[in-house]
Each structure stands twice: as structure tokens, then as C-alpha cells.
């Protein structure tokens, strides 16, 4: 269990294939993937608070107030932890916060891996592909020259956060000498 989910888990599968093709056995692949389990970040913002309320993550009162104030939470996933990262007014501000958080991760937390070309960027969404493609363009402007893979969020994530969520993620990728 390398505690990855959705788009960062996709990169883990690609890493496992890279290691397999390089002649590593299952135990070696498992070891590498588990060693790198914390080398990823996901920032997600939601269209609605409805599913957080239904899942018991926020109270009905908080959901009602948040909806009236157009609050968009930015959630962060690192390893197995899902935490509130920020509360913003509107999706535009939420996207700015997510991009700034990702830039901070790249410049600080993952700086050494970025220098060595061991990081990759992902964009993800639930349902609204058109909005997701626009956000991918914003990510590309913030990270010029970096390939960005975009996929729908997994159903296991989507059922908790609802339609209209968008995310930016990064994960360390395996580089075999």
C-alpha cells in the first residue's frame, strides 16, 4: 500500500511497469513504491458542499453557510491524509490557491526531485471536462514546459466530493538508470 489514490496512483502503476521492464522483481517494486509513498500531493476544490455534508465531513449548518457565502474548500491529500488546506470565496480563488500550493511544493518539498526530472504533474476532475481543460491551461501557464496528464478522478473519490470538482496533483516518478 503506497497510499496513493486516483491520478497519483496512476503514476505508481506506470512506475511499477517501468521497474518491471528494468528487470526488478515484485518485492523490489513493492519496496520502491512504498519508499516513495509520501512523494505526492493532490489539491482539490469542490463545486458543492453537498457531498461533504452527506458524508458527515461537515455539518449541515456549515454546508448551508458555506453555500450562501460561495465558499469553496481546497482539500489536500498527502499520503493517506485528506485535510482541509484552505477556504476560498469562489472557484477562481480556489484555483489560484491550488496553483500556489503546488508551486510551493515544487519549489520546496519536492525541489530536489524537480531538479532531477523525477516529478510529474496531473490534472483531474469530476464530470466537467470543459472546465478541467481550462484549468489544465492555467496549470500549463504556471508550469511552462512540463507535461500535464489529465484524467477523471476515480469513482472512489468522486462519490465523496461530487460533480464539478477539479484537482491539480504531482507525484514523484521512478527514473531507472
Describe the predicted segments one by one.
Residues 4-177:
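Mixed-charge interfacial surface used for oligomerization/domain docking
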Amino acid at each position: 500500500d503506497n497510499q496513493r489514490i486516483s491520478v497519483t496512483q496512476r503514476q505508481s502503476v506506470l512506475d511499477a511497469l517501468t521497474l518491471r521492464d528494468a528487470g526488478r522483481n515484485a518485492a523490489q517494486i513493492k519496496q520502491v513504491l512504498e519508499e516513495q509513498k509520501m512523494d505526492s500531493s493532490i489539491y482539490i476544490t469542490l463545486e458543492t458542499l453537498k457531498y461533504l455534508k452527506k458524508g458527515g465531513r461537515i455539518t449541515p449548518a456549515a454546508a448551508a453557510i458555506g453555500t450562501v457565502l460561495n465558499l469553496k474548500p481546497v482539500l489536500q491529500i498527502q499520503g493517506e491524509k485528506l485535510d482541509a488546506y484552505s477556504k476560498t470565496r469562489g472557484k477562481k480563488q480556489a484555483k489560484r490557491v491550488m496553483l500556489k500550493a503546488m508551486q510551493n511544493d515544487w519549489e520546496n518539498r519536492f525541489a530536489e526531485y524537480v531538479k532531477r526530472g523525477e516529478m510529474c504533474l496531473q490534472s483531474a476532475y469530476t464530470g466537467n471536462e470543459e472546465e478541467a481543460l481550462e484549468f489544465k491551461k492555467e496549470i500549463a501557464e504556471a508550469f511552462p514546459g512540463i507535461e500535464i496528464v489529465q484524467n477523471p478522478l476515480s469513482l472512489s473519490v468522486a462519490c465523496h466530493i461530487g460533480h464539478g470538482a477539479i484537482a491539480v496533483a504531482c507525484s514523484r516518478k521512478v527514473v531507472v538508470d
